[in-house]
């Protein structure tokens, strides 16, 4: 009986012990889960410190120097602008008109023009430029490594530079045609205005182009200490537009037309029969606008008007 009683007591005691263990196991699991959960928790300031350098690095890679003058800022300027102006670090007391003349030469480089002597020295390094384009980044960087060569006359009021237009490798090299690629850039300082004229080289009878610029609008009279030279310049996007629109692009188009090179893709590169098909949709006032573009379009616009008058009379 005693043995049976002890077995019964042991049998009754067993569930009691297992129940306590079952209650302890969930508590241990919860504690383990809590311990495991606390291992991955990070302070917010630590996460931010690891991310900030990455954001700064990504931002710095996106900020690069612009390609052309019109996109220049006080912090970032084109590489060719920096190269050319660094050669004039000791000439900070130059007149503001002369600085504006140098900016004009930078725009000329972007439009496919170069100073003649520089062209002769760097000709073997210059890449061909097609007739329907003008900007070549590699050419501009190479040519900007040389100083701008120009004459200064009449007490620092007149600046004269001889330019040459860049073309592709298939351009003819006859003397008469090469002369058509030469032009003269002259800037005259008149008070606060700089009169800039781009004329074909003699004996050409083709017209020239000119524009008047306000010196103080684009170049400040004061140079800040410990600041780059280009901090004096303002509204370079407007300056670039004025020079390209009124000087360099019209002159380049005129030179290419004189050499009978098609400015494709453009209206000047179409077959002759297509001009009449296009111009017949224009009224008289629109034809007059087209006729003032150049002699080529003037001829076709007048032919369309003549055919209209002839058809109306018949």
Swiss-Prot record:
Region Disordered: start-end pairs: 1-62
Annotated stretches, region: Required for interaction with skpA and Cul1, but not with PI31: 257-314
GO cellular component term, pick one: SCF ubiquitin ligase complex
Origin superkingdom: Eukaryota
Domain called F-box: residue spans: 264-309
Xref: InterPro entries: F-box-like_dom_sf, F-box_dom
One Pfam family per UniProt: F-box
Principal location listed in the UniProt entry: cytoplasm
Phenotype of gene-disrupted mutants: Male sterility.
Gene3D superfamilies: 3.40.1000.30
Bias-annotated ranges (Low complexity): 21-34
Molecular function via GO: cysteine-type endopeptidase activator activity involved in apoptotic process; ubiquitin-like ligase-substrate adaptor activity
Distribution of this protein across tissues and organs: Expressed in testis (at protein level).
Localization per record: Cytoplasm
GO biological process, one term: protein stabilization
SUPFAM superfamilies for the chain: F-box domain
Keywords annotated in UniProt: Cytoplasm
Subunit field text: Component of an SCF (SKP1-CUL1-F-box protein) E3 ubiquitin-protein ligase complex, at least composed of ntc, skpA and Cul1. Interacts (via F-box domain) with skpA and Cul1. Interacts with Prosalpha7 and PI31. Interacts with Bruce.
Function comment: Functions together with PI31 to control non-apoptotic caspase activation during sperm individualization. Positively regulates PI31 stability.
Protein name (record): Protein nutcracker
Species per Swiss-Prot/TrEMBL record: Drosophila melanogaster
Gene: ntc
